[in-house]
């Protein structure tokens, strides 16, 4: 995390960005997030990138989760049924995998406003066990933006019942305009119309 936050902010010493006043100070430097909405509610778009090895969403990672990610309005969402290789206790998904899904939908919620960011802080509450082989839905959304400091929230729900299985909050450091352009070009990022059902299970935005 240390090297990622330093790279995102482009200056030494920004690893303290998660510590209150230091966050505000580091966020005041460089470009603020654009805030340009690229997805509107009810118009679900699929996030497409070049093949890569991200554990959460990379097509080239044979051990990964292979999440399909979508944005709808100001949120990112995904649905997946976790296979046995992600087991913790018998029949239950490992907590680290749940954290990964929550982090991923929060990180990509920034794409709904044409931004990219790196995780500075993540807090997770586990509500109920996540069963293997059963479809779950992850949803992440932005709660506030202060210059380049973006606060987010997320949850994992059972789409059949609406029961909340896990929740999270996180802080991201948004990339400046030059770094964002570099990343978008490297990964050939684009948003395309999604055939998937974008219906949210409700809840806070």
Predicted regions and their residues:
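HotDog/MaoC-like acyl-thioester-processing domains
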Residues: 1-45, 130-132, 143-205
């Amino acid at each position: 995390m240390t090297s990622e936050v330093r790279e995102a902010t482009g200056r030494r010493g920004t690893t303290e960005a998660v510590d209150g006043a230091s966050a505000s100070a580091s966020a005041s430097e460089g470009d603020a997030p654009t805030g340009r909405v690229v997805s509107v509610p009810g118009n679900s778009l699929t996030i497409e990138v070049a093949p890569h090895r991200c554990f959460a969403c990379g097509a080239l990672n044979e051990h990964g989760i292979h999440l399909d990610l979508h944005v709808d309005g100001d949120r990112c969402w995904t649905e997946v049924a976790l296979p046995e290789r992600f087991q913790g206790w018998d029949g239950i998904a490992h907590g680290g995998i749940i954290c990964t899904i929550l982090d991923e939908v929060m990180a990509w919620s920034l794409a709904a406003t044409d931004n990219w960011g790196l995780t500075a802080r993540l807090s997770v509450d586990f509500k109920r066990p996540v069963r293997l082989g059963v479809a779950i839905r992850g949803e992440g959304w932005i709660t506030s933006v202060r210059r380049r400091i973006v606060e987010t929230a997320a949850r994992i729900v059972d789409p059949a019942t609406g029961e909340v299985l896990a929740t999270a909050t996180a802080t991201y450091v948004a990339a400046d305009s030059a770094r964002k352009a570099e990343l978008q070009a490297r990964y050939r990022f684009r948003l395309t119309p999604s055939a998937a059902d974008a219906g949210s299970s409700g809840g806070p935005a």
